[in-house]
Every structure is written in C-alpha cells, then in structure tokens.
Curated annotation (Swiss-Prot):
Species for this entry: Synechococcus sp. (strain CC9902)
A GO cellular-component term linked to this record: cytosolic large ribosomal subunit
Keyword line: Ribonucleoprotein, Ribosomal protein
Family membership: Belongs to the universal ribosomal protein uL29 family.
Matching InterPro entries: Ribosomal_protein_uL29 (IPR050063), Ribosomal_uL29 (IPR001854), Ribosomal_uL29_sf (IPR036049)
Identification of the protein by name: Large ribosomal subunit protein uL29
Pfam families, sorted: Ribosomal_L29 (PF00831)
GO biological process entries: translation
Gene Ontology terms, MF aspect: structural constituent of ribosome
C-alpha cells in the first residue's frame, strides 16, 4: 500500500479526509488487536498507517486554521 503524496491528500474533500481518518483509526485498532493476540505478521503496517493518519490530520488541521483566520 503506497503512501499518498501530501498534494494528493490536499486535493481530497473534507468528507473524504474524515472518512479516511476514521478508517485508519479502525485499522490501527485492528492491528493492535492482532498484535496482542499474536496474529500480526506484517508489523510494518503500523508505521504505514500512523504516517498516513498523521498526513491526513495535518491537512485537516491546516484547513481548520485557515478557515478560523
């Protein structure tokens, strides 16, 4: 799963960003559950999901700050 460019993330609508954030939070929860039950084989998925989530949250907060100004 390739990491999206920041420019690609910035082109998404607010609803799409919120949807992707919710999906990634669910994915991270599922990954933690799999790790706790020793079913997780690909531990690099944690890093990928956290980086994608950080990108989305950064763009979301940038938009919130720009509308507040």
């Amino acid at each position: 799963m390739a990491r999206p460019n920041t420019s690609e993330v910035r082109n998404l609508s607010d609803a799409d960003i919120n949807e992707k954030i919710d999906g990634l939070r669910r994915e991270l929860f599922q990954l933690r559950f799999e790790q706790a039950t020793r079913q997780l084989a690909n531990t690099h998925r944690f890093k990928e999901a956290r980086i994608k989530l950080a990108q989305l949250l950064t763009v979301q907060s940038e938009r919130q700050r720009s509308t507040a100004s």
